[in-house]
Regions:
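Dinucleotide-binding Rossmann-like beta1-alpha1 core, especially the glycine-rich loop
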Residues: 64-115
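Residues forming the flavin
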Residues: 1-83, 120-123, 127-217
Length: 217
């Protein structure tokens, strides 16, 4: 075993980054593993050279620290009405509280203060829609922009570097199991890391991880 941790988090997208930020203040030893490149090293040959997709593995657009949305225009929809069904599990009030909490973290790391989709103009459009038997569901949006989105994620990464271990360009090949529980991971290069808690937050690896859960069940 190369090293033991309290927590190993697999996947360096938004979920992995936010999980690490939350746990970093809990006096735990944490390892975050991401198979893609660091956010400022992610390059796409197709975008930079104007050529056809080179089928890079892993793809630097969809993989890497910051996740698939790192190079998006950074729109944060601040409502439980869109983006999933979390409110069905937690209730609307708790979901809205979590949305507000996460939004506050984005602002802390540099997201702009301005929020679109609120105010008198929206109320006016909503009223006009009702006159035509239509229902407008206003959704507040914080627009970071592509460049600022990357900067926000970079600041989060820099914060994490002082609290946790980051292993980038490292693919997890196997979950180590003992006594019916996950005990750690083995990387594609053969390194083994033990842990008490294993968190998998990877979109790309969800099918693989579901198979692991099925084996444990």
């Amino acid at each position: 075993m190369n090293k033991n941790y309290d927590v190993i988090s697999v996947g360096g997208g938004p979920a992995g980054i936010f999980a690490a930020l939350e746990l970093a203040g809990q006096n735990l030893s944490i390892l975050l593993i991401e198979k893609g490149k660091d956010i400022d090293e992610r390059r796409c040959p197709m975008r930079e050279a104007g050529r056809l997709c080179a089928s890079c593995s892993p793809c630097s657009i969809t993989c890497g620290l910051g996740g698939a949305g790192a190079f998006s225009d950074g729109k944060l929809t601040l409502s439980s009405k869109v983006g999933g069904h979390l409110d069905e599990y937690l209730g609307e009030a708790e979901t809205e509280a979590l949305v507000k909490y996460v939004d506050g973290i984005y602002v802390k790391y540099g997201a702009p203060e301005r929020v679109y989709g609120t105010g008198e103009k929206v109320d006016e459009i909503k009223y006009k829609a009702s006159l035509n038997e239509l229902r407008l569901i206003p959704v507040p949006i914080r627009h970071m922009g592509t460049e600022n989105c990357c900067q926000v994620l970079t600041r989060m990464r820099d914060e994490l570097k002082s609290h946790i271990d980051l292993k980038l360009e490292t693919a997890v090949e196997e979950v180590l199991i003992g006594n019916g529980a996950a005990k750690g991971v083995r990387t594609k290069s053969g390194e083994e890391y033990g842990c008490y808690w294993l968190v998998s937050l990877s979109r790309h690896g969800k099918v693989w991880f579901m198979l692991v859960v099925w084996v444990l069940a």
